[in-house]
Amino acid sequence: MLDYPYENEWNLGVDAAIGRRFGRHTLVFRAGFEGRWGGDRKGESVWAAPSDYYNRTYSGAFRYAYRARSVDMEFGLDYYRDDVAGRDAANYFIPYAHLRFDLGGGGFVPYVELDGTLKHNDMRELMETNLYYVPRYTDPMPRNTVDYSVRVGVSGRLVEDKLIYRLFVGYSFIENHNFWYCYTPTTRYEGFSLVQGRLNVMSLNGELEFRPVSNFTFSIGGRGLTYTEHQTLSIGLPEFEGTIRARYHHRKFSVGLVFDLQSNRYISRVIPWFPNDGIVGNMRIPYTVDLGLNVDWYASKRVTVFAEGHNLCNRRIYDWSAFPQYSACLLY
């Protein structure tokens, strides 16, 4: 085990919004600030550095919406000013447009969606994403990830709203995507780190939900993905994801079954400190099948007792290569 320093972090977020509705029109203005500060590192190791870090984001947004019987539309613009310690401040403008056209009484609704997000890459977020992350304290923290996305598709409700479907094609342009890599097991530095780069993602998505009776729901969904990366490292993402869900509701309890599938993934193995030049191969994360069960018992109007089961097929599941989950697990 590598004894590297631990990190403290605290955050502060403030949001405000003002809007007005007149007839079928709506105007909304939003402003916000989110800051994360860290430092006070403890311990001594080759990874340590004396500098603290901060991750501050200033945001603003404008929305105009118009809603009618067969047409819903919303337009706007999001602004982010990103300030990460050790990095030049960056400004991002993300357009926003959602258009929906009901051409068949809810049964056939074409739509177009254009939007985006900013995802923080502070210490807490990275450790929640990958528990085996070993930061290099001699480098600044990574930039925040910005995602510009567009989706074109159709949705609808059929058979007296018992059948709901959604089909769409999506395309995302991702700036500062985190390309994770793992260190070679032949070195004393085991764990994961990352480099950042651009990634383009195209996806074909389908979702179907069937409710034959009011207290039972069955749904199935899947998506195929293709990637255009601008890095020599493997992206560590699947080319197919699928989900099957079933849930039964009763006045006193509910039972849900979840079946998740994920295709093979590959993560690069590198020699420490040389993520682009020291690649020694790829680690394959095998096809994942995960069966889960969750039960809720409504003991009273205010008290619910729950139980959840995960990996009930008792397979070796890898969230990250070289670190598998073993056996089934239960949570009460």
Model-derived segments and spans:
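Outer-membrane beta-barrel domain signature, especially the mid-to-C-terminal portions
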Residues: 124-143, 174-199, 225-243, 261-298, ...
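Repeated loop/turn-to-beta-strand initiation elements of outer-membrane beta-barrel proteins
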Residues: 22-29, 68-75, 106-110, 160-166, ...
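Long alpha-helical, hydrophobic tracts
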Residues: 51-153, 163
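Outer-membrane beta-barrel transmembrane domain signature of Gram-negative proteins
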Residues: 2-69, 73
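Transmembrane beta-strands of outer-membrane beta-barrel pores
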Residues: 2-3, 22-24, 33-39, 66-70, ...
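Residues on the lipid-exposed face of transmembrane beta-strands in outer-membrane beta-barrel proteins
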Residues: 14-20, 33, 60-66, 97-101, ...
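Membrane-embedded beta-barrel scaffold of Gram-negative outer-membrane proteins
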Residues: 106, 144-191
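Residues that define the transmembrane beta-barrel architecture of outer-membrane proteins
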Residues: 6-14, 52-58, 89-95, 144-150, ...
